[in-house]
A protein has these predicted regions:
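Conserved, well-structured functional cores that handle cations and Mg-NTP chemistry
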Residues: 2-157
Length: 157
């Protein structure tokens, strides 16, 4: 996204014409406006159902398939999405005297998905397969989440 487009989006946000996800992902550009738009649609659905699975969140098969197509598109880089979110998180830290950086490691189990590739052991069992996710969440002392500052994903061989 060039400087002119960033300025246009910033002015639209200031005028109240931009949804929350456009502010959150300001500057993110997949090189295809359809993908940029699809991210917004996906984020709005996820906002309404943050803990639901993709099929539960998107309800219809067509919407579910569109979400899966988005995530499998080679132009969609999860690192770029997270980088944009992390930048927005850092901007929300401004003016806060104390920020809590809360960390936790979670094991994501795919043990029932035998054909999934790229997984590792998540405990001492040879049958428990998945990956580890370690986010650092920025939170105010009042408990308001500001976003993810950092995240690490790894598999244990």
């Amino acid at each position: 996204m060039d400087a002119r487009e960033k300025d246009k989006r910033a002015k639209a946000y200031e005028a109240g014409d931009v949804s929350w996800y456009e502010e959150e992902f300001l500057g993110l550009n997949f090189g295809d406006s359809r993908l940029d738009k699809r991210l917004g649609i996906i984020m709005n659905y996820r906002l309404k159902s943050p803990s639901g699975s993709i099929p539960d969140t998107f309800v219809t098969w067509a919407k579910t398939k569109a979400a899966y197509r988005f995530f499998s598109n080679d132009k969609v880089d999860p690192e770029l999405i997270m980088k944009s979110h992390k930048n927005s998180t850092v901007s929300r830290l401004s003016g806060k005297q104390i920020i809590l950086a809360i960390q936790d490691t979670t094991d994501i189990s795919y043990s029932s998905h035998k054909d999934t590739e790229g997984l590792g052991y998540i405990n001492d069992s040879e049958t428990a397969r998945g990956y580890h996710y370690h986010p650092t969440l920025a939170v105010t002392v009042e408990g308001t989440p500001l976003g993810i500052l950092d995240s690490q994903v790894w598999v244990r061989e």
